[in-house]
Amino acid sequence: MGHVSLRKLTAFCALALAGASLQPVAAQNAAAPAPASSTAATPAARPADVASEDAVIKAVYDVISGPKGQPRDWDRMRSLFVPGARLISAHTGDDGIVTAHVMTVEDYIRLGDPLLKKDGFFEREAHRTEDRFGNIVQVFSTYESRHEADAKPFQRGINSFQLLFDGKRWWVVTIYWQGEDSANPLPAKYLPGG
């Protein structure tokens, strides 16, 4: 879910969320009530977007990707996520401490929309590993982020998708991501051919 640059969005989200009184996971109260957005009605999904785990992941990448100035279809994004879903970025601060910045889908839209439109952003999956049990699937999706569709990636990393099949459709429960950096290069097993 790298944007403008994954680092810029992660830093922006971290700062904006701190200003919005959202805190890293370690500082959150587990007994806190669910946010209002978790009870809002979810827009109807396109059947093709939620027909398989592959389809729902492709739909997420598709909805966040687009050229500079292009509005994103945020209702399509909302339709992919289970109510109460979370998007979480692992961010390394200037002090070297890694924290998890937790966002609702609405937080992500509010923070990401201006950045995605300002610079253009394309993210695609380069490789995937998957674990499955019953109706749940955990996917490590190696991503490549670009400002233009055919440009060299400016960022790579892992999007960790947790998915649920409810018997009728697939839902995204969580996306948890971290960008590659010099301290954490992507292992070969998460690269094409790995």
Regions found by a protein language model. Name each.
Residues 1-13, 22:
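Bacterial N-terminal signal peptides that target proteins for export
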Residues 28-79, 191-194:
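Short, low-complexity N-terminal intrinsically disordered segments enriched in polar/charged residues
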Residues 17-27:
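C-terminal segment of classical bacterial N-terminal signal peptides
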